[in-house]
C-alpha cells in the first residue's frame, strides 16, 4: 500500500474544515443534505452539533457555486471581536428578545442588500446597471464610506437611527429611514434583468455567542432576514449555519419559531453507511487505493477483528456518529500503527486512540453544554470507575450523591440548578445531551440522543441505562468497549417527540411551582400546604446563598419558628444582612392570609433574638410587596423604632417572581440584586416615612 500523505500524524486530513481543503477537494462526500441545498431553495438554515460538517458544507457549497459564472457568492464568517462589537449597540434591548430580534432583522436585511449592491457595483460587467439607481447609489456611497467589516458598518447604521431612549419608535421607523423595501426591489430587479443569482453563505455565528436576549435576538434576526430574502426573490439565496445548542436556544425563546423557522431547517445527521463512505474515500486518497467498494477499502486498511462491517462499527462506538470524531480516531490509530512500521491498524491502535479521543469528547461535552447545563461536568464526573450499564434507580442515586459535593463547593448556578431540577430532571438532561442511552424493552436496543433532545416520557426505576461508549475510557469505566453484537443494538433516537431539554425542564419545574401557589386555598385550610410551598420555593430561590433551610427546626420551643436557613454571608445581600443585622439564622414566618396585623409583626419580632439577629421575613398572600400606608408601614416602623428589628414583607407572589428569574441559569445573581433593592427601599424610604399612627397621650 503506497502512502500519499504529507503528515503521518493526520493521514486522513485535518479535523477542522478550514485546514482540510486538500482532502475536501479530493474526498468530499456529496450527502443528501448537500444535494438538497444545491438543488432546491426550500431550506435556509443548516443546523448541526460540533463536528458534523457545517464548515465543510460551507466551503464546498462555495466551491460548487463558484463554477457557475451567473452566480455571485458572498461569504461571511465573523470572528469574536466583530460579534462583541455588534452586541454593544444592542444594549438598549437587553430586557427584550422581541426588540432585539426586530432591530437585528432589519439591520441584517439591510446589510445583506448593501453587500449585494456593493459587490455588483465592483463587478466589471454589472457595475453599469447600478449607476442609474439614484436611491441605491446614495445608500451605497454611505455604506462603502464606512471602513471595516459588515458588522461594524451595521453598528454605525444602528448608532445613527436607533434611539436608546425610545427603542420601540426608532425600530418602527428603521425600515423607512433605510428605505429597505425600495432598495430590495431595486436589487431584485437589477439581478433579474442581468440574469444573475446571489448566494450568501454565513458560518461561525457561534463566535462570542451568549445565550441572552441580545445573543439569541441577533441569531433570530439573521434567520428571519435570510428567510424573508429567500422567499421574496428567487435570485437571492441566503444560507446560514448554526450550531445545535444555539438553534435550540432560538427555538425555545422565539414564540413564532414553529410558524416561521421550523420548516426552513436542515439538521445534519450521519449514519454508519455514510461514515463508512467518508472513511473509505479518504483512505483511497491517502493510500492511493484503486478499490471500488467502501467495505473492501476498509478491510484493506485494517487487520484482525477490525475487518468487516462489525469492525467498522467497533470504531464508531467510540464516536458520537460525527465525522470529526471518526477522523480523529482514525488519525490517532494510524499514527500509532505508523510508529510501529505497520500499514494497517489493529485493536491496540484503536484502544490507544480511543483513550485520548474519549477524554477530548468528554471535555467537548462539558464545553458545549455548560452554559445551559451548568452542573454537567460535576454530575458526569460522578460516574467514574463504575459499570457503564446501570438502572435508572442507581443512576439517580449517583446523581443525588454528587449533590453534597456541589453544595460544599457553593457555585450558585450549579446549586440552584440541582435544587430546581432535582435528580430526575438532571437525568433527563443527561439523556438529552447523549451522555446516557435508554434500553428499549421491546427491541432490547439502546437509544441515544445526539441532538440535545429529550424523550417524551419519564424514566422508570427498573429501566436500564448505558453511558455512551465514547466516554467509557475518559471516565475509566470497568469496560472499555462494546461487543459488536451490543453495538448493533445501539440506535440514535431521531424520531422521538421533542418536548423539552435542560432549559425546558427548568422552565416546566418553575411553572409547576408558581401554578401550585394559586391552587392553595387561603386561610387555615391551606396553611400546612402553603408552608410546604414556601419551604420548597425558598430552597430553590436561595439555594446558593442559604444552607440547611428547614421547617420547624425547634418544635419543642415555646416560640414556633416556621422556616429558617443558615446565612453564611455568601452574597452581597446576605453579607449585608449578616453584618448590619447580625442575622446568622434567617427566619421566614409563613402566614397563609393576605392582611397582616400587629399580632403577626409582634410574633415575628419576638423570634428575633440571639443568632436570629434583627431582621426577619413574613411570607403572606398579598399581591404586592409594597407596604400599605397606615397598615403594614406603621407596624414595620413600630418594630424598627421600638425594638430595632426590621421585618420585611415577602409575599408568595414576590417569591414566584424571583423564581421566574431562575429560568436562565446565567442570571443566578439577579435574585441577590432584587433582594438588595428591596432592603434598600426599606432602609432609605419606608423607615424614613412618618408614621400615620397617633402618639398616645401620657
UniProtKB/Swiss-Prot annotation:
UniProt keywords, alphabetically: Plasmid, Transposable element
InterPro entries registered for this protein in UniProt: P-loop_NTPase (IPR027417)
Domain of life: Bacteria
Protein name from the UniProt record: Putative transposon gamma-delta 80.3 kDa protein
Organism the protein comes from: Escherichia coli (strain K12)
